[in-house]
């Protein structure tokens, strides 16, 4: 999935300046999303996880539709929600003795 998005981004960057394509936002959101997933946020912080997942999927759709400004904003929102979900999950796991 990651390589597919990067291929699309690289192929479209020839048509659009690289400043408009939110590659950094995508990369940071993806890393935060994976970290939250690894922290078992879906179990320990489901509402935050759901927000991160929804923002991430909507950002992917916007990116595919070349709405790069919207995609960048949504990737940032997804990253923030995923980071909160990861932190909340780690705290909840620790409190539950599952760490």
Locate the predicted segments by residue.
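Short, charge-rich amphipathic alpha-helical segments embedded
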Residues: 73, 79-96
């Amino acid at each position: 999935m990651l390589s597919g998005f990067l291929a699309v981004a690289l192929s479209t960057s020839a048509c659009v300046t690289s400043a408009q394509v939110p590659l950094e936002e995508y990369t940071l959101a993806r890393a935060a999303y994976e970290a939250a997933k690894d922290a078992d946020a879906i179990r320990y912080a489901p509402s935050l996880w759901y927000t991160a997942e929804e923002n991430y999927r909507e950002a992917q759709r916007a990116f595919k539709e070349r709405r790069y400004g919207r995609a960048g904003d949504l990737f940032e929102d997804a990253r923030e929600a995923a980071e909160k979900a990861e932190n909340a999950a780690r705290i909840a796991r620790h409190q539950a003795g599952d760490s």
